[in-house]
């Protein structure tokens, strides 16, 4: 089984234009992500998918293959599908380009799902949710079945509880979703060829298209999310964190 990791890195960003190239402790952000991904033991190859020559140069400087993709692709999944068009592989892991502290171990937990069950369609990550996160529309929730397969994703608190958030506390039936995925190559192609589903458009969550198509999505439980960079404020907090750790 050949498993590849793809890092989609688009230059344009509503909240943080040029984010993959911003300086973090002397290196472009994209290089941190690439170096973390290269520590995976299960990935055969790491590829950066981008629409910008500067990102291409930064990625090639740390020794990874780069595929140029259309800047108008609608989703990160479409960018990944385009990037592997000429790549022979069975499974692809979507590694977010704005996750500079991603670890090889985390990537391998996703990849291992397909080693254990080659018939799985997708895998993703989630961690315990707090009462505050449960009520936040910015926190995507996932509920799972007894096999830790996704039943539904939503921005809305779920499942419905007759108790208040304070009484319910951190609900075991609900997890906070982390937007990192692995797909079988065949399912990724099917996903990208399908039109957006009504539930996907209603919640603005592309993973709901996968559920609409009948996909099995394994949810891997982790203790906490890695640190993502969505805004300049996130970058400042991360720099402070790294400094406190002597990095």
Curated annotation (Swiss-Prot):
Q: Which reaction does it catalyse?
A: 3-deoxy-alpha-D-manno-oct-2-ulosonate + CTP = CMP-3-deoxy-beta-D-manno-octulosonate + diphosphate
* Gene Ontology terms for molecular function: 3-deoxy-manno-octulosonate cytidylyltransferase activity
Relate the protein's function as given in its record. Answer: Activates KDO (a required 8-carbon sugar) for incorporation into bacterial lipopolysaccharide in Gram-negative bacteria.
GO CC annotations? cytosol
Q: Which named protein is this?
A: 3-deoxy-manno-octulosonate cytidylyltransferase
Task: Identify the SUPFAM superfamilies for this entry.
Answer: Nucleotide-diphospho-sugar transferases
Q: Which domain of life is it from?
A: Bacteria
Question: Which UniProt key words apply to this protein?
Answer: Cytoplasm, Lipopolysaccharide biosynthesis, Nucleotidyltransferase, Transferase
List the pathway annotation: Nucleotide-sugar biosynthesis; CMP-3-deoxy-D-manno-octulosonate biosynthesis; CMP-3-deoxy-D-manno-octulosonate from 3-deoxy-D-manno-octulosonate and CTP: step 1/1; Bacterial outer membrane biogenesis; lipopolysaccharide biosynthesis
What are the recorded Gene Ontology BP terms? CMP-keto-3-deoxy-D-manno-octulosonic acid biosynthetic process; lipopolysaccharide biosynthetic process
Alphabetized Gene3D superfamilies for the sequence:
Spore Coat Polysaccharide Biosynthesis Protein SpsA, Chain A
Q: Does the keyword Transferase apply?
A: yes
Look up and give the organism this protein is from.
Bdellovibrio bacteriovorus (strain ATCC 15356 / DSM 50701 / NCIMB 9529 / HD100)
Enumerate the subcellular locations listed in this protein's record, separating them with semicolons: Cytoplasm
Q: Which family does it belong to?
A: Belongs to the KdsB family.
The EC number on file is 2.7.7.38
